[in-house]
Amino acid sequence: MDQLYMTVQDYLLKFRKISSLESLEKLFDHLNYTLTDDMDIVNMYRAADHRRAELVSGGRLFDVGQVPQSVWRYVQ
């Protein structure tokens, strides 16, 4: 039986319920500590970085992989 992974989009939708960087970091730390599957961890990291970019751009939403390069300089 194949294991089902949460996709980047799945994690992004979960992270979009959060409107502050502080709360995002709390959820990120929790998931980072509890996830064990490498694919899930990679997808979660990608989605968290994506959400950080959305938050630093004033809450503007971007499709996965479509964050403007100019926004990334503000993501820590």
UniProtKB/Swiss-Prot annotation:
Transmembrane segments: none annotated. Disruption phenotype: No effect on expression of pathogenicity island 2 (SPI-2) which is usually repressed in culture; derepression of SPI-2 in double hha-ydgT deletions. Double hha-ydgT deletion mutants lead to deregulation of many genes at least 2-fold, most of which are also deregulated in an hns deletion, suggesting there are a large number of hns-regulated genes whose expression is also modulated by Hha and/or YdgT. Upon infection of C57BL/6 mice a single hha mutant has 10-100-fold reduced virulence compared to wild-type, while a double hha-ydgT deletion is 6 orders of magnitude less virulent. InterPro entries: Hemolysn_expr_modulating_HHA, HHA_sf. Pfam families: HHA. Signal peptide: none annotated. Keywords: Transcription, Transcription regulation, Virulence. The keyword GTP-binding does not apply. Belongs to the Hha/YmoA/Cnu family. Binds to H-NS and modifies the range of genes it silences; H-NS alone silences 'core' genes while the H-NS-Hha complex (and presumably also H-NS-YdgT) silences genes acquired by horizontal gene transfer. Plays a role silencing virulence factors in the absence of factors that induce pathogenicity. This is Transcription modulator YdgT. It comes from Salmonella typhimurium (strain SL1344). The lineage of its organism: Bacteria, Pseudomonadati, Pseudomonadota, Gammaproteobacteria, Enterobacterales. The gene is ydgT.
